[in-house]
């Protein structure tokens, strides 16, 4: 990476020239964002509790050269000489990445999730081929970024970003190297310069950690991710924000932290999440619990159920025993008077669906080609943090709390779904226009994901609690309006999600941030 950085030609530009210009090809429309001076630089964040690093100093970072040294003076001279005559494309890159490293890499991850959220089609033999991580661009492409997969990808991304930034903050305030423009006022800074020390570069830390995780999660996108990494690092010198040694130290730290995070990912049980050999036993176990009519795929040909063993994947904020203890009890089953009442409610909606009900069902559908409910809530979290002018590390903390809650919600919900294996309304003649999920009904994934995220966001942004909770309620009821869930699936999914969110909050309250 050092060689790549040193070979780039960098030039700078003032922020007044850059305002309003962006450079990213987006398949999903996102709000335009620009850089800001954070409300707080969170100078004590190097002491915050990490998820996987034993301490903020587990990975060593060498001390930088003094700002009076000949080596650093040479770096400043190179930066100054390159900080002029930017091309329009370079100007656009400065503004795009200046909106925030954590913000942009989360956005990129969501776009990749949407791009890969396409279920495999059946072949001529009536079989559904399984995407192959070793050949990710073959048909069907790997991964199928369904809600559980996306929740996991975003969780690992956010944890890597957060742990890497906690370590970076520790070394920033240990070494206290000032930003280049504060050492040499003749260097034009094209983005807001805060009191945050520059070594190691927070942007390089986030970029390197993010690319390592995303290459593992989306292995067919390696050239694209390498290009984004190169552009991000270059933009920091085009903007006059970092010298090469800032970037090199940050890149090395981000790579090392991400390698540790991927160590967990390789052993968390995801490799067995699609074990279809387990489904026969799951169905028999569900029958022993009173489920007389288990779920059946309504696709033709019948599609194997989505990730039946995702419920066995390792959680973040509670252990396996707790997962089983908080599993919702199913209050009634197919054939009961209570179930019939809920089926009749769906039939009534099918016959007399209002425009508002249809709008809500479609707005929250988050089906194929979208970044799914976990991505929807990550976007809400990132936007709220950006609007609040959070520092990079506080933004990363926000997304790590939401991300781990969302992955835990996916695991706990999927464990519940295959524990009870209940049929969807479509097995009893109802139709849907929002896409029919290929897995059991109870409980609602949308409800569980949404309540978990809204609970965490209400803790982080208490002045917006009512808004987030109302959105979770709407996301939940959207599945009733879409005719793919019974009311009990949604109501108990919401309760389950809130409990899961509360575990993430407990972790947040104990992380040393005082937030």
Identify the meaning behind each predicted range.
Residues 2-11:
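Bacterial N-terminal signal peptides that target proteins for export
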Residues 13-17:
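Hydrophobic helical h-region of N-terminal Sec-dependent signal peptides
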Residues 19-23:
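C-terminal motif of bacterial Sec signal peptides marking the signal peptidase cleavage site
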Residues 25-515:
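Acidic/polar surface patches and capping/hinge elements
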């Amino acid at each position: 990476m050092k060689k790549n950085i040193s070979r780039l030609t960098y030039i700078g530009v003032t922020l007044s020239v850059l305002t309003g210009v962006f450079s990213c090809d987006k398949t999903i429309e996102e709000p335009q964002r620009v850089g800001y001076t954070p409300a707080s630089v969170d100078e004590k964040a190097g002491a915050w509790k990490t998820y996987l690093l034993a301490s903020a100093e587990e990975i060593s970072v060498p001390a930088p050269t003094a700002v009076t040294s000949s080596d650093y003076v040479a770096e400043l001279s190179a930066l100054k000489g390159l900080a002029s005559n930017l091309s329009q494309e370079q100007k656009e890159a400065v503004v795009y990445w200046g909106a925030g490293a954590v913000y942009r890499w989360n956005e990129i991850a969501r776009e990749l999730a949407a791009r890969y959220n396409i279920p495999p089609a059946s072949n001529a033999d009536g079989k559904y081929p399984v995407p192959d991580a070793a050949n990710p661009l073959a048909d069907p492409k790997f991964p199928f970024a369904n809600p559980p997969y996306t929740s996991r990808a975003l969780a690992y991304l956010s944890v890597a970003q957060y742990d890497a930034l906690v370590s970076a903050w520790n070394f920033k305030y240990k070494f206290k190297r000032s930003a280049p423009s504060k050492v040499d006022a003749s260097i034009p800074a094209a983005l807001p310069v805060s009191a945050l020390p520059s070594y190691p570069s927070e942007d390089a830390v986030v970029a390197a950690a993010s690319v390592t995780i995303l290459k593992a999660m989306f292995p067919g996108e390696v050239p694209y991710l390498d290009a984004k990494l190169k552009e991000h690092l270059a933009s920091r010198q085009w903007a006059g924000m970092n010298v090469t040694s800032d970037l090199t130290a940050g890149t090395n730290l981000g790579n090392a932290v991400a390698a540790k995070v991927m160590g967990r990912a390789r052993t968390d049980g995801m490799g067995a999440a699609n074990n279809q050999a387990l489904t026969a036993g799951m169905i028999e176990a569900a029958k022993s619990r009173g489920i007389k009519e288990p779920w059946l795929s309504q696709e033709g040909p019948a599609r194997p159920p989505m990730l039946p063993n995702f419920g066995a994947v390792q959680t973040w904020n509670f252990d396996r025993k707790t997962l089983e203890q908080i599993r919702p009890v199913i209050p009634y089953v197919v054939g009961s008077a209570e179930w019939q009442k809920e089926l009749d409610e769906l039939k009534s909606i099918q016959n007399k669906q209002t425009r508002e009900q249809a709008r809500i069902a479609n707005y929250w559908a988050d089906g194929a080609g979208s970044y799914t409910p976990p991505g929807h809530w990550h976007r809400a979290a990132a936007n709220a943090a950006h609007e609040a002018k959070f520092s990079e590390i506080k933004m990363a903390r926000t997304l790590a709390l939401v991300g781990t809650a969302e992955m835990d919600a996916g695991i706990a919900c999927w464990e519940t779904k295959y524990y009870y294996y209940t049929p969807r309304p479509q097995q009893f003649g109802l139709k849907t226009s929002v896409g029919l999920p290929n897995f059991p009904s109870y409980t609602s994934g949308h409800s569980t994901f949404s309540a978990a995220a809204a609970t965490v966001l209400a803790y982080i942004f208490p002045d917006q609690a009512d808004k987030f909770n109302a959105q979770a309620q709407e996301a939940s009821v959207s599945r009733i309006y879409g005719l793919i869930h019974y009311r009990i699936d949604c109501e108990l999914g919401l309760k389950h999600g809130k409990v899961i969110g509360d575990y993430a909050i407990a972790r947040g309250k104990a992380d040393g941030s005082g937030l």
